[in-house]
Amino acid sequence: MISAIIPTLNAEATLERTLLSLNGSPLITEIIVTDGASTDRTRGLAENFGAKLCFAEQGRGQQLAAGATQAQQNWLLFLHADTALEPGWEEEAEDFINHYPSQSAAVFRFTLDESYFLARALECLVRLRGFLFALPYGDQGLLISKKFYNELGGFRAIPLMEDVDIIRRIGRHHLVFLKSKAITSAERYRRNGYVIRPLKNLCCLMMYFFGVSPKFIKKFYR
């Protein structure tokens, strides 16, 4: 029923948890790992889980698009390599597939994998952003029918902001926020700070809306 598509680049530290959250699910009939020239154990982990391994130029947009072209199922689940879906996510996802129009897409609930109070505060801000502006994080995954995805033109080969780009094309009225959690690694927030990293994300978003080149935004993001 669903092809799961995971873009990777040196993701050995988190990929196993992501694959475990999908492996054995009755809804997931295909897992595609699209790798951007990893030099660690990423490819071996993918193969050990029986995932279909394909390769693409580095860049999340390019890698997601390449994975989608390999998908054989009618539904696509795009998921970052540092994000795992909580147990039981299938029930809500199946309900979405069965009861919402085919021209709809769904995202999961942003959750970080640590108990620090700033992590909870950030989760609340992300939910508020989704409620007010219908702009979820890419970390929340994306469940969409292959037909609707193709009608939208799919992910574009841009180095950053590919998630915002496709969400804007989906549109607020076609987007469903599920309650099931997408549990994301908090490593980058621990490394860069729970204030600096979100502010940097916001700056990137504002630059994108003002028409700044995604290539420049990527340099700033780094």
Task: Locate predicted features.
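Short, well-formed alpha-helical segments that are part of the catalytic scaffolds
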Residues: 5-24
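Short aromatic/hydrophobic "clamp" motif used to bind/position activated sugar donors
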Residues: 76
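Conserved donor nucleotide-binding strand/loop of the catalytic core
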Residues: 29, 43-70
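Hydrophobic helical membrane-anchoring modules
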Residues: 168-222
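A conserved acidic beta->alpha catalytic loop
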Residues: 35-43, 83
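Conserved donor NDP-sugar-binding/catalytic core segment of glycosyltransferases
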Residues: 88-118
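Cell-envelope/extracellular polymer assembly enzymes that use nucleotide-activated donors
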Residues: 1-3, 30, 165
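Acidic helix N-cap motif at the loop->helix transition within catalytic regions
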Residues: 13-17, 40-49
